[in-house]
Amino acid sequence: MFLLTAHVVFATITGNNEDVADIVTEKLEDLGCQVTETEISQTDAAEFQQANICVVCAYTYDEGSLPDEGLDFYEDLQALDLHGKTFGVAGSGDTFYGEFYNTTVDHFEAAFKLTGAQQGATSVKINLEPDQAAIDELDDFASQLVAHAQAKR
């Protein structure tokens, strides 16, 4: 049987997006994937070329800004050719920011689409720390990513 590989990249200030990444990683592993989880400033976007499933879990800073430590990653991601890959984006934010709530999720989704990768699950936006409902949503997100990647095999 073919082993799916996944790479989960996160950016966090409060720890919430690392929690999001950990939840996704754990579910992917439970589903039989070989998973690498890394922090965005320590990751070269080109590492996604080695994975079947590519995931970003990142925060939105202030009024809609991408994480400073993830700007190079974001720019490099857009230049990659990820045809044949499955991607997903999730993030924790704060609804206090209104129209800017979790906009980084939207930016990374758009960046992935430029690479030719296929979206394997609807992006997930979590308010603050993941509660049980959010964990269930993230588990479903991970399951959808695996199902999408398996269907492409």
Where do the language-model regions lie?
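FMN-binding flavodoxin-like domain, especially the glycine-rich phosphate-binding loop
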Residues: N16-D19, K27-L31, Q50-R153
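N-terminal beta1-alpha1 ligand-phosphate binding loop
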Residues: T5-V24
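A short beta-strand-loop structural module common to alpha/beta enzyme folds
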Residues: Q34-T43
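Short, surface-exposed acidic/glycine-rich loop or hinge patches that mediate macromolecular interfaces
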Residues: A11-G15, Q42, T60
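N-terminal amphipathic/basic-hydrophobic helices that include classical n-h-c signal peptides
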Residues: M1-F2
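Short, flexible active-site loop motifs that bind/organize anionic cofactors or intermediates
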Residues: H7, T38, L128
